[in-house]
Amino acid sequence: KQEVAEIAQLAEHHFVGVKCGIMDQYACMFGIEGHALKLDCRTLQYEHQKIILGDYQLVLIDSKVKHELTSTEYNKRREECERALSVLKKYDPALVTLRDVTQDHLTNFGKDLDPIAFKRCDYVIKENRRVNEACQALNANDLQLFGALIYQSHEGLAHDYEVSCGELNFLVDATRKSDHI
């Protein structure tokens, strides 16, 4: 399964032209019903986080928005993150990926980042923290906290990483207006 995921990622890189990560491929190969998949993209270690819904239901909505990563800003976002990392590495050579960057790094050395690179780096730091908090919420069966973190994740994607679209923003805003979601 891991080899299939890695081959699929390489196909995206070489034939599609998108320097994507491996999360989607891993989710397809290793996802199991009733669980979220927490993936460490550095080590490729993963764990399944059981989702106990109780009286809740999980609803997925197809926005009907079609896109290809080659025509989106995906590669540009990768470049912006890599640029931020290269600047921060001047202060801390032990940094390997943006995952290693802490809020302290950003506070102390972020002045040398352009505003866009700073925003992208800040998003990655916060999103990594949210993933861990979301797993803790699932383990504690705290679905309200989990839902709040999902909303925060969307806000970060929309405003800090700038990869959302009007249709998704509309759907998220519509769900927020309901007392039942």
Residue ranges of predicted features:
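C-terminal nucleotide
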Residues: 35-181
